[in-house]
């Protein structure tokens, strides 16, 4: 997917053109009526696109199809919690590209990935309803998840939507909470599971295995020097992981490729920026520039600083052996499931 390109209007405000070839993705809150016949809209952060998010989006799409109207999902970039905690943002469950592709893949006709900046944060909830939901999208129905809030100081909720809808000609409702793995599905629970290395619970809440995708970039090639060449992924947003993992890499061949991966700053070699490094077992190809997905199966250990490179190499041998064993057992269980 091509990167968004920005330009400035006469007032110096950033204007973002659609970055989807079918013009299904928009970033601006200004502009003409996008859905002249009306629309069915859902709103949320959608970080992770977990089972609760998917239930909300699928319900919105079903309602839109029943009414013969376009389905619209509204979200934000950066996420509001990232904007308000810029110095220490919560870790991402799903990177921007994955969120866009996931939402469009659920069948929405338009996706609003609205730029969350200081001006947007200061917009009163009432103005958001009038300007965006009605003025931009012609909303006929608005759907939200449990406890969703919007607008300046989180002043908008379901009651406000319903009151303004009665005035402006749309209905508003929320879907029921989704339960899985012994409790309510939430992004917080998923982050806790990932931090604990509990990928089974994370997968149960997400409705799929936890993966991180990105384009393979050139690193310092230290892994090759140490006998463990890696496919390196950098991220604009820090995922909710840190440590050494048994992983599958998708996008290399017809089947997932067994691998051992490290996410962190590589303290033994004085690394600084977070980097995901995936060593694919018995692989000899060139992956530079290719988009791959790394599926996390098990957490092996914390990232740590070793006294010297020989000590690091010895541990890498142990990590690789453990990852091979875990993945072999995982593959056996899949085959008999």
PLM segments and residue spans:
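Positively charged, low-complexity intrinsically disordered leader regions
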Residues: 15-43
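Residue-level signal for inorganic ion chemistry
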Residues: 50, 103, 142, 202, ...
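N-terminal Rossmann-like or analogous alpha/beta NTP/dinucleotide-binding catalytic cores
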Residues: 82-168
